[in-house]
Amino acid sequence: MAKDIRVLLYYLYTPIENAEQFAADHLAFCKSIGLKGRILVADEGINGTVSGDYETTQKYMDYVHSLPGMEELWFKIDEENEQAFKKMFVRYKKEIVHLGLEDNDFDNDINPLETTGAYLSPKEFKEALLDKDTVVLDTRNDYEYDLGHFRGAIRPDIRNFRELPQWVRDNKEKFMDKRVVVYCTGGVRCEKFSGWMVREGYKDVGQLHGGIATYGKDPEVQGELWDGKMYVFDERIAVDVNHVNPTIVGKDWFDGTPCERYVNCGNPFCNRRILTSEENEDKYLRGCSHECRVHPRNRYVSKNELTQAEVIERLAAIGESLDQAATV
């Protein structure tokens, strides 16, 4: 059965004059054609994921390709049965990718148009995965890695991408003299991060051109050597990559069983992304810790209108109580 919705993933590092006004004009156009999605605009370029029917997405691609400097922008296209977004957002930011360094400033930032790692095709990247002398580094957030990753890729001990440069500096002696290849969802983070690694003194740095999204669609590699699913920042949450021998690597936060279902912790002040089944979400009140389960603003409790007696009953079932000491 034909799928009616297309999801477009794209980015482009290119100077945008008066980027704030560009963002406002871009939002107006997107709304005028009924497009849904999330787009970041900065002086350094544009990064977005949008969705709509064939006619709407075609209008959008034609519009973007008509803009100065964006004639060759590369859209990665998925076909889906449902919209990937509920609303349309276009926001101006100082950068479309922020490295999060204390010594980083916007005037002395990495410009991928000048400094970036060598581009690797899916075939070349697969060869790198099989090369025991090559270090493969996942540059994404921890919860993205936990849902799926390339076989043998290093999972940095970080929570999010902004912590990665410091982690690399702290572990410099492990990688400095080796070939390092990096990857991310669509390529936008790696463009800048691989450039930063080059500036740090790494001599042999490569990046997966087009990211995981392109690797999974390549007719030759067909996503092989990818384990799990790819995390995406829209309503789909997870998409398939490996079309040869797919596996599940995600583990339920509470019992460690195979799982590919993400939810946010019920405590709005925590909001950690956790993998869990519906059964365990109910059992543990969607709280990643005791403190989050008993938090007075637990969203799971309020959404399901649980009484205090019901909360106490569920806590007792897992050996906890309202007044016990926090375990985090």
UniProtKB/Swiss-Prot annotation:
Q: Which PROSITE patterns match?
A: RHODANESE_3
Q: What is this protein called?
A: tRNA uridine(34) hydroxylase
Coiled-coil annotated residue ranges, if any: none
Q: Which UniProt keywords apply?
A: Oxidoreductase, tRNA processing
Cite the source lineage. Answer: Bacteria, Bacillati, Bacillota, Bacilli, Lactobacillales
Q: Which HAMAP family match?
A: TrhO
One matching Pfam family: Rhodanese
Q: Which domain of life is it from?
A: Bacteria
EC code: 1.14.-.-
Q: Does the keyword Plastid apply?
A: no
What the protein does? Catalyzes oxygen-dependent 5-hydroxyuridine (ho5U) modification at position 34 in tRNAs.
Q: What family is this protein classified in?
A: Belongs to the TrhO family.
Q: Which GO terms describe its molecular function?
A: oxidoreductase activity, acting on paired donors, with incorporation or reduction of molecular oxygen
Residues in domain Rhodanese?
Answer: 130-224
User: Which InterPro entries does the UniProt record give?
Assistant: Rhodanese-like_dom, Rhodanese-like_dom_sf, Rhodanese_C, TrhO, TRHO_N
